[in-house]
C-alpha cells in the first residue's frame, strides 16, 4: 500500500522531467531528415522584414553569427513578403544587393525605420533615402523595378512556402531545422542554438 501511495509522486517527477526535455527540444524544430539545399556548404536562411521590430532587435545577434561563421557555412538573408505591403522592402533589399550596397545599408535601413520613424514603405520614400545616403537613386529605382528583382522576390516567397514560414524573424539551418526568437528565452540563447545546429550538421 505504501508503494501504491508513492506512485502518483513518482509519476509527477517523471512527467516534470519529461516536460523539461520537451521544453529543451522546442528551442528548435526538425522539419526534415534530409538536407534541402543544393550547396555543399551549411546554409543558414534568415527570413526577415525591415518593418519587423523583432528582426531589428535580432540584428546584433545575426551580426555575431555571421562574424563567427567558418568557411563551410553561409548566411543568406531572405526578405520575405508574407503580406503584400511587405513586398516593397523585399524589392528594396534585392535592389541594394544587386548594387552591392546591401552590406552598407542593411542595418541603416532598420535604424531609419525603427529609430528615426521613417517607415520607408514606398518606392518614392526609399528613393529619397538612398539619395540622402549619397548613392545613385536612379540606379536604385531601375533595379527596384527590374525583372531580376521580381525573380528574387518570387524565389524568396517559394522558399518561405517550402519551409512554411509564417512569421519573422525565422532561421532555417541547412533545410533541416527551424528556430526563432519565440522558441528561446534570449537572443544569446538563439545564438547558442544556431551554433549547436551547425555542429550537428558538421557531424552529419
For each feature predicted by the language model, list its residue ranges.
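Extracytoplasmic thiol/disulfide redox context detector
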Residues: 2-84, 154-157, 161-162, 167, ...
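Conserved strand-to-helix beginnings and helix N-cap segments that scaffold or border functional pockets
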Residues: 56-59, 86-90, 184-187
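C-terminal cap of thioredoxin/glutaredoxin-like
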Residues: 132-204
Amino acid at each position: 500500500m505504501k508503494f501504491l501511495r508513492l506512485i502518483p509522486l513518482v509519476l509527477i517527477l517523471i512527467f516534470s522531467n519529461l516536460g523539461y526535455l520537451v521544453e529543451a527540444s522546442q528551442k528548435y524544430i526538425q522539419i526534415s531528415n534530409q538536407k534541402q539545399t543544393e550547396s555543399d556548404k551549411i546554409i543558414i536562411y534568415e527570413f526577415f522584414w525591415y518593418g519587423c521590430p523583432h528582426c531589428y532587435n535580432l540584428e546584433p545577434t545575426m551580426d555575431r553569427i555571421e562574424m563567427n561563421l567558418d568557411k563551410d557555412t553561409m548566411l543568406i538573408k531572405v526578405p520575405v513578403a508574407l503580406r503584400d505591403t511587405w513586398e516593397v522592402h523585399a524589392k528594396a533589399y534585392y535592389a541594394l544587393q544587386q548594387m552591392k550596397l546591401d552590406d552598407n545599408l542593411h542595418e541603416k535601413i532598420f535604424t531609419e525605420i525603427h529609430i528615426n520613424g521613417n517607415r520607408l514603405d514606398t518606392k518614392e520614400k526609399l528613393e529619397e533615402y538612398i539619395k540622402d545616403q549619397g548613392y545613385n537613386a536612379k540606379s536604385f529605382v531601375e533595379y527596384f523595378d527590374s525583372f531580376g528583382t521580381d525573380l528574387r522576390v518570387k524565389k524568396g516567397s517559394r522558399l518561405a512556402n517550402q519551409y512554411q514560414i509564417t512569421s519573422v524573424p525565422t532561421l532555417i539551418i541547412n533545410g533541416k531545422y527551424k528556430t526563432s526568437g519565440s522558441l528561446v528565452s534570449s537572443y544569446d540563447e538563439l545564438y547558442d542554438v544556431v551554433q549547436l545546429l551547425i555542429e550537428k550538421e558538421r557531424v552529419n
